[in-house]
Design a protein with these regions (language model features):
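Bacterial N-terminal signal peptides
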Residues: 7-19
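Hydrophobic alpha-helical and helix-loop surface patches within well-folded domains
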Residues: 21-22, 33, 212, 243-506, ...
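N-terminal, polar/Ser/Thr-rich
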Residues: 22-69, 149-154, 172-174, 467-469
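A surface-exposed beta-strand-loop module
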Residues: 25, 84, 88-148, 169, ...
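Ligand-binding face of N-terminal immunoglobulin V-set domains in extracellular IgSF glycoproteins
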Residues: 69-88
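Hydrophobic helix-coil surface modules that form long, contiguous segments used
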Residues: 70, 159-162, 169-328, 357-360, ...
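Surface-exposed, acidic/Ser/Thr-rich flexible loop segments
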Residues: 118-191, 505-517, 521-523
């Protein structure tokens, strides 16, 4: 099946334009403005003022393969002398009743259902609707995953941020919370789970109907159920029962006992920290096949990505910590997001930032040896800074006119900047005030909604200080500061150390951000242990001087008075322990020392990771040559023994070689990298996690004749360096051979498909197929991204990187403009993270000025592109702009 990209985009553009014309029709009916696409903010405000005490009694029959037959009774209190409007975008309605009286189906317009005031009562109302909703692998509110291993089907819902109205008619906005009662009819061999607990089950005529308890108040995006022949494992600890559901074919691979134990620990810690018990009736979790993101916090039925939670090969420390962090994140949501929910999706950061930050706090206490704050830095700061220093950045609080734009709010600002800012807030006010404010916030708004002002108000009150300036600068102000270190040394002493703020982008305005940070000063040690001395890998150095000082940043320029008169340093770092939210611009002395070997003597792994990050920022700003960074990295990697730092270094090494290096230098640097990585992967003296990271990096970089031969050798053996070569690693090798167009690639691909017939193997085969180096394959995949209704989003998003491999830019450049032209379709028809993945892959699969000009021309050709989409394009095009600049600077 093939569709020409230009034809497809023309249809999408015409459809979008027709919709916009239709919306311009004027009318004197004041409610008509509310009946357009999505849920507008004015509609949401109006309904929140006229509708209350909502209850949904929802019945669904999911015995058919592609549709669910449903009935919902909506009870609510209505005030005011006006109509009521429900939201509905499902397949079709079959009947509408309002307080026992019929409404014509024409009351629905494809987006909403209007109930005239004459059919409503002042006070209690009951409306009933009969409907049919879609079931499909993608693009539907009920996702169907077919397991080819045993022929089973599994269903689950995913309604975030505003797709509940595809499942059933409802008031689909977060501040109209409702109590929900499910009734689910399924095939008799299936299990069903939902937000509530099962109270009874009735069997008849080859089906089973389960009735569930009424929930506590929930926002519509949190309503959820799942159905299928799940295998269930239950654990009871201190009277709390938690069940894990996983599909039958993967049950033996699942470490159910570990996952349940981690969940019990997570809930216990959160209950203690928040000072209130788990706020919902039950807690079950399920591993969802083809789940399009990491997890979703539905109360009572928390869903996780199956592939991220089932380890098909021995997991490294980062993978184990990542899985536990995801559990902690979703458990934290039960209080922050579920118990107390943002009033509108402009405050999305409130729940996501808090969940990530609380997960880090919990991990630090529950796993003291995990270096949780180093993990937090590596997981959040590079991603946050990478977006927040672009011209497409947004404030944490993102103005949102309509919920159909809410998907655009998801990204690094919400998930990575927000928790980083909360860490600064916690440090600023102190732990006692922070926790007391959180307690009061949860108490005041339990089972209701709140705003960021409510949160800062309580924390500020607990700390006895106003946080108005903090809110203005970190919640409402776009962008971020850069902090330049200015070091003056005289007679072997520090004469002055000054920290100077400036905005990373002019859109932030010139004012300083109020912050507190800690400054680290690395002094020379007697015996010549300085940047020019003999190399001493990763030792902890001691000095009689105080090494770090707290500093309040309240002005554009701030002197570190405590540093005055101290020994002239080897280097300085302005954000020790990562409390500040700013990009550190190192002084020339520090850059010279760190890039000449001093970095190798820093014994603190957390500090070392941040210093590597500061040097990488020098590379991205075209101030440090990428080949110099690669050489430094390769010289230090053999000595680095931190399992969390090594993967970060290897990722940057790969980017510097594959994207930033001038073509004339690629062959030499790649050969050095292949040698270092191959030796490291086979060095049995290294911890497993480091050897695995070296092997993964080798697979991602190998391109020489010798490198390809080594890749092929991995497929010919059962083990390497004492470790089994499992299928996930074999697939990575196959992917690389396909990207390179190696002579053995197709044979290896066919052999691996025959070898690995598991559900995960079939997914990986689809992903690998996108890497095949032919124009016909690219055309076929691009068409399937739009036209294949059986293609689920997890598979599609997973293949985007292979489709856009840097080594195949000549094949993929023709698809860059069609990919950009399709953005309205992607936003309307794909889930929350797909848009960012799409843009990141298609734009940053390129390093050429021609690709950059394609992006710029797209923006110039669409001056009326919706603001949120323009921002997403600008966020993602920043990297290719840097790439082109770096390659020109260091060619």
């Amino acid at each position: 099946m093939r569709i020409h990209p230009a034809s497809l985009v023309a249809v999408l553009t015409l459809t979008l334009a027709s919709g916009l014309v239709a919306q311009r029709v004027k009318t004197t009916d004041p409610l008509t403005a509310y009946l357009g696409h999505g849920v507008s903010h004015p509609l949401a405000i109006w309904r929140a003022n006229t509708i209350s005490d909502v209850r949904y009694d929802l019945s669904l029959d999911v015995t058919a393969p592609d549709s669910a037959v449903g009935h919902v009774s909506v009870r609510f209190k209505h005030s005011g002398n006006s109509d009521a409007i429900l939201d509905w975008r499902g397949r079709r309605l079959t009947q509408i009743m309002s307080n026992g009286r019929s409404l014509p189906l024409s009351a629905a317009n494809g987006a909403h259902i209007r109930f005239p005031v004459k059919l409503l009562e002042a006070g209690e109302n009951s409306v009933e609707l009969w409907f049919v909703s879609d079931i499909a692998p993608s693009g539907a509110s009920i996702i169907r995953s077919h397991d080819q291993t045993d022929g089973s089907d599994y269903l689950y819902t995913l309604l975030v941020p505003a797709d509940a109205d595809q499942l059933f008619p409802c008031f689909d906005q977060p501040d109209l919370k409702a109590r929900v009662t499910f009734t689910l009819t399924t095939p008799p061999a299936w299990t069903a789970l939902a937000n509530g607990s099962i109270v009874r089950a009735d069997s008849s005529a080859g089906r089973i109907t389960r009735h569930f308890t009424e929930t506590r108040p929930l926002s519509t995006y949190l309503i959820a159920f799942a159905a299928g022949p799940w295998q269930r494992t239950t654990s009871v600890v201190k009277g709390r029962s938690i069940s894990l559901f996983v599909r039958k074919s993967r049950a033996k691979e699942t470490d159910a006992d570990t996952l349940l134990a981690l969940t019990h620990r997570a809930i216990g810690w959160m209950e203690q920290y928040f000072g209130r018990p788990y706020p919902f009736e039950k807690f079950d979790l399920m591993l969802a096949p083809a789940f399009p993101f990491g997890g979703m916090e539905h109360p009572g039925v928390v869903m996780f990505n199956e592939d991220r939670f089932i380890f098909r090969e021995r997991p490294t420390l980062p993978r184990r910590l990542g899985r536990f962090s995801t559990i902690l994140h979703e458990v934290a949501h039960q209080w922050f997001g579920d118990l107390v929910t943002m009033r509108w999706f402009d405050d999305l950061w409130l729940k996501e930032g808090f969940a990530t930050y609380m997960a880090a706090k919990a991990l630090a206490e529950l796993e003291p040896s995990s270096d949780a704050w180093k993990t937090f830095y590596q997981s959040n700061k590079p991603a946050a800074y990478g977006v927040d220093q672009t011209t497409g950045t947004t404030p944490l609080w993102q103005e949102l006119a309509n919920l159909d734009q809410a998907k655009s709010a998801y990204g690094a600002i919400v998930y990575n900047k927000a928790p980083s800012v909360l860490k600064q807030l916690n440090y600023l006010v102190g732990e006692k005030a922070f926790q007391a404010g959180v307690h009061q916030f949860l108490s005041d708004h339990a089972y209701a909604n709140a705003t960021w002002q409510d949160l800062l108000g309580e924390i500020g009150k607990a700390g006895g200080r106003s946080l108005d300036a903090f809110g203005k600068n970190f919640m409402q102000r776009p962008g971020m500061p850069e902090v330049q270190q200015r070091l003056t040394v005289r007679d072997g002493k520090i004469a002055k150390l000054e920290l100077v703020q400036k905005p990373a982008q002019a859109l932030s305005g010139p004012a300083a951000w109020p912050m507190r940070t800690e400054v680290w000063i690395e002094y020379p040690v007697a015996g010549g242990n300085d940047a020019s001395g003999p190399y001493e890998p990763y030792v902890t150095r001691k000095t009689g001087e105080a090494n770090h000082f707290p500093v309040e940043l309240s002005a554009v320029a701030t002197e570190v008075v405590a540093a005055r008169g101290k020994l002239a340093p080897i280097f300085v770092f302005a954000n020790y322990q990562d409390y500040g939210y700013f990009l550190t611009l190192l002084d020339s002395t520090s850059v010279s020392s760190l890039s000449s070997g001093a970095l190798g003597r820093v014994g603190d792994g957390f500090l070392r990771a941040m210093l590597w990050g500061a040097l990488w920022d020098q590379v991205r700003d075209a101030q440090l040559a990428p080949d110099r960074f690669a050489e430094l990295t390769l010289s230090m990697l053999p000595y680095e023994m931190d399992e969390q730092v090594v993967p970060l270094l290897l990722g940057r090494l790969e980017r510097s070689i594959r994207a930033y290096l001038a073509p004339a230098k690629v062959v030499t640097v790649t050969a050095n990298a292949e040698h270092t990585l191959w030796d490291g992967a086979r060095d049995s003296r290294k911890p497993y996690g480091i050897r695995k990271a070296f092997l993964d990096a080798f697979i991602g970089l190998a391109s020489s004749v010798d490198g390809v031969a080594k890749l092929e050798s991995l497929l010919a053996v059962d083990s390497a360096a004492g470790e089994p070569v499992r299928d996930p690693t074999r697939w990575s090798v196959v992917n690389r051979l396909l990207v390179l167009g190696a002579a053995s690639a197709e044979r290896a691909f066919a052999a691996q498909m025959s070898r690995d017939t598991t559900p995960d193997g079939r997914r990986r085969a689809f992903v690998a197929g996108a890497a095949r180096k032919t124009a016909a394959v690219k055309a076929d995949y691009f068409a399937r991204y739009f036209a294949d209704k059986g293609l689920n989003e997890d598979w599609a998003s997973g293949s985007l990187g292979e489709f856009n491999a840097l080594e195949q830019q000549d094949l993929t450049l023709p698809y860059l403009r069609p990919a950009l032209d399709s953005l309205p379709f992607i936003q309307a028809n794909r889930r929350i993270f797909f848009l960012g993945s799409w843009l990141g892959a298609f734009i940053n699969g390129h390093t050429s000025d021609a690709a950059l000009q394609t992006v710029k021309k797209f923006l110039a050709d669409h001056p009326k592109l919706p603001k949120d989409l323009r921002e997403k394009v600008l966020q993602n095009s920043d990297e290719i702009e840097r790439t082109v600049r770096i390659r020109k600077r260091w060619q």
